[in-house]
Amino acid sequence: SAKKLLEDAYLTQSAAFHIHQSVEKCFKALIEDLNLRVPKIHDLEKLLGIIIEHDIILKTNTEIISMINDVYIETRYPNNQGLIPEGIPSIEFIQEIYSFAETLYNEINQLLDK
């Protein structure tokens, strides 16, 4: 879904939401593969922490994870204006986090195939 929304400046908040969902599901799939109970949380930093605690090191960027987390919270639970603190996410920002999520998906997919 996020890929279809990448080029529309009016839909960047929706794209950010779908990107977060994608990263969240990837992390949860990896946690499930470790035979752990998958927590009912949406916090990417906490999910990544669980993965790291089990000695799995991903080529991830915690700064981008934090940004995706922040955008998700603000798009899911917007303030009075319905915007994230910095305003509506730019297309460039959405393309950056989409590219990151796609790379992360491929990395986790390879780990799950082993």
Predicted regions and their residues:
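Terminal alpha-helical segments
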Residues: 1-114
